[in-house]
Structures are given as C-alpha cells and as structure tokens.
C-alpha cells in the first residue's frame, strides 16, 4: 500500500474534484481510493493498493496538481485555516478534540499509510475494506465526472449509495435491523452536529416532499426488482462479508463509517449526512408501517 497527499491552496470541493479527476486520468489502474481531509489544510489523500514505485506515484500526483492548481494562486494563511477548521477540530473524533496544528503549503507530499483497523472490524478485514473503498471511489468518480458538480448531484449520488447499502443490509440482517441502522446513523450525526456547536436540540429540516420523493424512489426500485439498484449504483462489494460475525451495534458503527467515507468522496460528508440519515430513517420506517 502506498500513499500520497495533495495539499491545495484553498478549501472547496470543486478544486478537490478537479484534482481527483485529473489523478484518475493519469493513474494507470483502478486499484486506488481517495479521501478528502482538512487537518493541516485542505487536501486529498490518495492510497494505492499496488506497492510498486513510490517515486512514480509522487510524479503522477504532481502532474495532477500542476495541471489543476495555477501558479501563484492565493493561499490560505494560518489564521484563515484555523478559522475554517475550528468547528471540525472542536468536534474531533469520538468526542475528543483535535489539535489543528500548522497549515501545510500547497503541494504534493509522500505519506505513510496507517490503516484504521479498529474502525472497520480489525486487521482480518483489511483486504475486504480495501476492496470496499476502491469500489466506493470508482462509484464516486462517476458522479464527479462533470466539470460542475452541483450539491444536488452530490446528494443524489449519496442517497442512491445509502439506499443500496440499506437494501443489501436488510436482505442480510432483516428489515428491523436496517431500520435500527438508519436511526443509529441519524443519532450519530445529531451528536456530531451538537459537538460542532449546533446546539443539543438542533434539527436539520427535511421537507415532506423530499421524504415522499425518496419513498417513491424506493417503492419504484423494489417494484423493478433487485437488478434496478445495480443500474443506479452497483452494490458495495464485500460489505456484508465484512459485517458478519459482529453484533448489531458494532455493525452499525462500521457501516456508518463506510457510508461516511463514501459521502466524503462525493464532497458531501459531515453536516449533510444528518439530513441524509434523517431522510433514510423516515423512508425505512414509512415502508415498515405500510
């Protein structure tokens, strides 16, 4: 496994999208995945399964960076960086705040890859989670293929992915368990928003028309048969294999993380995910009542 970080001069999903598309165009393979991150400044983290030439990977990443980021582009300074990431750093990981540290200048940097074994069920599942992430990245790239990716494109792609995940999860573990997963995701993001000073009673409004539209989509897909989901968003490979053998609470944690990483790749991770899980919870429970 090799890794490289492409640091950008400013925050914004559009610039990240462009660099990701360019790297995908120059990298000669599909055995890689990416995440967006903020610590040390806005950047894209590239991980390749191939453990070959690290110098070549750096060169390709620099090629993507140089093609997209203009020379002399104004960059964040330390104060602007700290202001931009304050809420994220305060919310932290697992309720523990993160020190945002110093801003790193825009450019390409080699980086070690440290797998988050515990988050995804242990070292035994490492090969499986790698396949899930490369598959997720390939799906996300389809949504990011446009020069102008709107918020609606991002959220529609996120909704299709999570509905497919829920469909597979319900088939494997039962509908009641899938409803519990949707509610666990909504509750998790409510806690995260509260940590970001949104207020302990904060609620993200979800319109009734949006709920009705999503519920209608689910009904139409069910009526069309199991192949319909494959047309819209191919099922995340190996996810159910990864989850077998864990109790429901652990399965929920692993799957919420997998969904979050997919949304991150789409550029709609974080705050929008509360609305997404609220919507999916609504849809799942509406279907249960019918």
Go through each PLM region and give its residues.
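An acidic, charge-biased composition feature
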Residues: 1-290
């Amino acid at each position: 496994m090799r890794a490289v970080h492409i640091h950008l001069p400013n925050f914004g999903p559009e610039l990240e999208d462009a660099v990701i598309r360019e790297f995908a165009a120059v990298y000669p393979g599909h055995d890689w995945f990416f995440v967006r991150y903020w610590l040390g400044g806005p950047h894209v983290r590239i991980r390749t399964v191939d453990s070959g030439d690290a110098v070549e990977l750096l060169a390709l990443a620099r090629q993507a960076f140089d093609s997209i980021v203009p020379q002399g582009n104004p960059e964040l300074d330390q104060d602007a960086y700290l202001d931009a990431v304050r809420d994220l750093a305060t919310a932290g990981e697992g309720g523990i705040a993160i020190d945002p540290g110093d801003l790193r200048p825009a450019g390409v940097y080699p980086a070690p890859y440290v797998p988050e074994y515990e988050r995804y069920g242990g070292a035994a599942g490492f090969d499986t989670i790698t396949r899930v992430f490369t598959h997720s990245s390939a799906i996300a790239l389809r949504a990011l293929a446009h020069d102008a990716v709107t918020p609606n494109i991002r959220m529609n792609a996120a909704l299709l992915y999570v509905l497919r995940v829920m469909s597979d999860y319900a088939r494997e573990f039962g509908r009641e368990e899938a409803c519990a997963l949707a509610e666990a995701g909504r509750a998790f993001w409510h806690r995260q928003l509260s940590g970001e000073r949104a207020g302990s009673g904060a609620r993200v409004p979800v319109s009734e028309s949006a709920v009705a539209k999503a519920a209608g989509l689910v009904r139409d897909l069910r009526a069309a048969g199991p192949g319909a989901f494959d047309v819209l968003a191919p099922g995340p490979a190996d996810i159910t294999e990864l989850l077998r053998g864990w109790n429901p609470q652990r399965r929920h944690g692993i799957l919420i993380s997998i969904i979050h990483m997919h949304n991150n790749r789409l550029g709609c991770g974080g705050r929008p995910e509360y609305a997404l899980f609220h919507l999916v919870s609504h849809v799942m429970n509406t279907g249960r009542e019918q």
